[in-house]
Amino acid sequence: IGFITTPSILAFSKREIAISKKNYKAFLLADAESGRILYQDRIYENNYPASLVKMMVALITIEEINSGRISLNDNVIISSWASKIGGHQVYLKQGEKFKLSELMKATIIGSANDAAVAIAEHVYGSVKVFIKKMNSRAKELGMLKTSFYSVHGLPPGKNQKIDVSSAYDFYLLALEVLKHPKFLQWSSTRLDSFRKGTFQLLNTNHRLIKSYHGMQGMKTGYHRKAGFNLVSTAIRKGQRFISIVLGAKNSRIRQKITRFLLDYGFENFKKYDLNYIGESISLSAKIEGGTVGSVPLKVAKSVRILLSDIERKKLRILPKIPIKTKAPIKANQNLGNLEYWLNDKMLKKVHLQTEFEVPKQNILFVITEMFTNLNETN
């Protein structure tokens, strides 16, 4: 999905805060609509996601809700095991009953580990089965560096394995999660309540949600080995970016790098309207055996591409049209493509269509043409 470009580091050196490789393990900035990666460092290296794993918990649960197998209104009875999970929690007690919607809020907004376990047990009957589904779903998404061993992301206990992933893999997961508005509704909520208002849920990303215009989450993660992680998304005037920071030294650096990346996106890239649906272009296709020798072409759909000003100047639009096409040809028939290239990467491809119908020559047409040509020569 998408491709990688690397702007000059000078683009960041002029900023107030320099990004130092000592302060983080990986970062990534991507355009959410096209999937194009705009800036990155060490995105394929193995890292520990910590609580970012709850993004996969949320995705699987939302997909099961959408399938109709479960509902946000389901009552979830808390097990003994879920009540014993430590770290970030909402202090669930064995035998308590909560709506699945409440536990989803606690997991996404408050990063509650006990709520994540309760959700997993409800959805598939056991945490073990849920983790198996997490790994199979990761494989489907192309998350090749990812191995999940928990639903909460806590440091492993004795004889347990630690969750492993990469910035690139969580970029793939973020793209999939963004297909579900309900997740953003939760992840962009700064403050909510739990247990009938007796417990407050403060978003673990509350500082950026409050201070960064357009911020909508998505998920924080931390433990000592992992460092400070954040998958975030922000939208302004219809333009959405995804930012990923892994292994930051502290939460302050995590926030600053996130601001860097998102600011870089919003300040340096914009969508260019390059072609419009039905737009005629100065190209035609040669037709063999038709009532005319060629047919003009038009663009099948509108084309908008996110580019920097410099990239716009470098963009090449290349037509790919068959040398000859045999009649008959229908009106609005796909006949070739326009390809939009930046350096050695194709950003987009759109079909070209015929402006009108071109019937096949018949005997009457051939005779008529012969007499016409004779009259013209006499």
Question: Where on the chain are the PLM-derived regions?
Answer:
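Compositionally biased non-globular segments, especially hydrophobic aliphatic-rich helices
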Residues: 8-9, 311
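Domain-terminus/edge residues, biased toward the C-terminal soluble/receptor-binding domains
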Residues: 143, 161-378
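Bacterial N-terminal signal peptides
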Residues: 1-4
